[in-house]
Amino acid sequence: MDPLLGKSVSIDPPALLRCPHDQVRRGAGVKAVVYDRYGSPDVLHVEDVPVPTPAAGQIRVRVAATSVNLSDWEALRGSPAYARIGGLRFPARRSLGSDIAGVVDDVGSGVTRFRPGDEVYGDNLALKGGFAEYTLAPESALARKPTQLTFAEASTIPQAGAIAWQGTERAVAGSRVLINGAGGGSGSFAIQLAKRLGAHVTGVDNAAKQDFMRSVGADDVIDYSRDDFTTPTQPYDLMLDLVAHRSVFAYRRALVPGGTYRCVGGSVHALLRVLAVGSVVGRLTGRSIGVLAVKEGPAHFQPVVDLCVTGEVRIHIDRTFTLEELPAALARVGEGRALGKVVVGPS
């Protein structure tokens, strides 16, 4: 069965890895999609690179699937400015891709939780490199993949799931929740999590995503190009903003007294305004306005994984692409056309 799209099956790990191990032993290169300057997807190219050697505490993973996050698009373009942290003029890392799923191929000294042949997944935000046949990841970033999920499904959860879980934890039964950017990966998880807690959920995204947001549970939907979600007839108890672009005062007026606004991504100006004056405006008006400081690691995405395994939360894969098709995959996410998550796998 296809390792990207098929369900996990019982298989002898050495057999699964035989060809790659031979390749590693010979010292041949492996495929990776790399870039050396910020820009459009056109700057990406496939290159043969040396097989990475795991350092102490690291794991080498044979990649089966890597999902695309908006952070990959931002790191490709070097915009917003915070995407250049660690690499002001040139990319800090040549290969993008943090949400990986695959098979342990080798381990560095000190690794105790995994061994070759284990199926793993996680958010490798520190090292990235998931858009390749092999990548390195810290042991602490990975968890064992549930047998009930395919590699593709598992790769969709770590970053998007952690954001959605932490961004909706204040939702309660009967509360009014708004999610801006609700038609993407984090947003589609967030809608389902808030609905599971009994909230009335409004999803905001472009016109092409209205039906999709309803299909994952949104009670109301807003096309941001037609309507201003910060001037509701009934204000919200919780707002999760995945693409912040408005003023702090606009967010304040959309909240009930005692309400909460948290943003994760968006324009630099909007984020700086929230950081600089959000807490002050919030205190003066009886609201909580701030940036969501997302906690990383398996402990913070495992709750969503558990719900996906039981079927309480559904995973929505919009499309799958090969490594060679990565430019198209990134453009689909970056241009706001993906419904849920986009996944990239080996050729």
What are these regions (language model features)?
Residues L76, I100-A126:
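A glycine-/small-residue-rich N-terminal strand-loop-strand element
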Residues A126-E139:
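A structural motif shared across PLP-dependent enzymes of the aminotransferase-like
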Residues H245-V313, P346-S347:
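Glycine-rich phosphate-binding loop and adjacent beta-alpha segment
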Residues H21-A28, G297-S347:
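C-terminal hydrophobic helical "lid"/dimerization subdomain
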Residues S155-D223:
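Mid-domain Rossmann-like dinucleotide-binding core that forms the NAD(H)/NADP(H) cofactor-binding site
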Residues S40, V49-A101:
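N-terminal glycine-rich beta->alpha transition that marks the start or flank
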Residues T231-L238:
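A short acidic, Gly/Pro-enriched loop at the edge of an enzyme's catalytic core
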